């Protein structure tokens, strides 16, 4: 039985910098609401690498009542308005991230005027730009900086972002925190994601899905659906419901 259906945001709920397909959003939201009265429809929540304010806003669209994952491994609890992480001491543990943020401000942003640092992020250093070619140009600089100064850090990229994380502070860690908070196992979770940062979590959940716009690495570890973004999320949600109904 799948007890949680989890979705990524960018590339799944919508294409970055584009208006969502509101008809699909409403259908996904309706299934989530219906889950509160049904044993076969799992509730919906989010696992994203984007910062808390964006994740919270989309969670409100979808009427998410469960904790959700932001910045890959931060778990926000509505109850008590609190954030849970796997870090022992955020200030000390994140010193390499703080250093990367300063380097991004001094070395990357002046060279790439359309790029911005994700200033609201707590636990990782994120760069966003609406043009894929800008992100592609930034990636080698970040790779070299990490290799030279912080070889243990993880880097995950999308068409519109570069994210630098503490080692292991990725979406699999976020999924583990989420599962523990709901007293379920990873074998009771379905997840849909589209880029490399989703791969660690997709490999470990029971039902991994991806939209047709996913990267090759993601398609290789998931059931790839013949639909993009929110259409694929809705399709995956229905597949999970049918799976539960068949048990």
Question: In which residue ranges do the predicted regions lie?
Answer:
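Mg2+-dependent phosphoryl-transfer enzymes with acidic/Ser/Thr/Gly-rich catalytic loops
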Residues: 1-2, 21, 164-165, 172-247
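A general structural motif
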Residues: 1-2, 41, 65, 122, ...
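Asp-based phosphoryl-transfer active-site loop
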Residues: 2-18, 202
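Active-site flanking residues adjacent to catalytic metal/cofactor-binding acidic residues
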Residues: 7, 70, 193-194
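Short amphipathic alpha-helical segments
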Residues: 18-19, 57-60, 81-82, 139, ...
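Active-site phosphate-binding/coordination module
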Residues: 26-114
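Short, surface-exposed amphipathic charged segments that create phosphate/polyanion-binding patches used
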Residues: 80-88, 170-171, 240-244
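Conserved acidic, metal-coordinating active-site core of Asp-based
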Residues: 103-204, 213
């Amino acid at each position: 039985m799948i007890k949680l259906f989890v979705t990524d945001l960018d590339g799944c709920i919508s294409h970055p910098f584009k208006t969502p397909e509101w008809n699909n959003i409403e259908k996904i939201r309706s299934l989530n609401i219906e889950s509160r009265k049904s044993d076969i429809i799992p509730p919906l929540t989010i696992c994203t690498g984007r910062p808390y304010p964006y994740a919270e806003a989309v969670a409100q669209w979808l009427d998410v009542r469960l904790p959700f994952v932001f910045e890959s491994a931060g778990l926000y609890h509505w109850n008590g308005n609190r954030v849970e992480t796997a870090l022992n001491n955020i200030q000390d543990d994140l010193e390499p991230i703080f250093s990367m943020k300063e380097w991004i401000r001094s070395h990357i942003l002046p060279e790439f005027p359309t790029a911005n640092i994700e200033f609201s992020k707590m636990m990782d250093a994120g760069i966003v730009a609406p043009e894929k070619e800008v992100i592609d140009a930034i990636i080698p600089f970040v790779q070299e900086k990490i290799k030279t100064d912080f070889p243990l850090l993880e880097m995950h990229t999308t068409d519109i972002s570069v994210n630098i994380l503490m080692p292991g502070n990725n979406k699999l860690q976020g999924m583990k925190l989420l599962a523990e908070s709901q007293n379920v196992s990873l074998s009771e979770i379905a997840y849909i994601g589209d880029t490399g940062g989703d791969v660690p979590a997709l490999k470990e959940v029971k039902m991994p899905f991806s939209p047709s716009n996913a990267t090759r690495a993601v398609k290789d570890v998931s059931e790839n659906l013949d639909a993009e973004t929110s259409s694929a999320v809705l399709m995956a949600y229905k597949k999970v419901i049918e799976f539960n109904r068949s048990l």
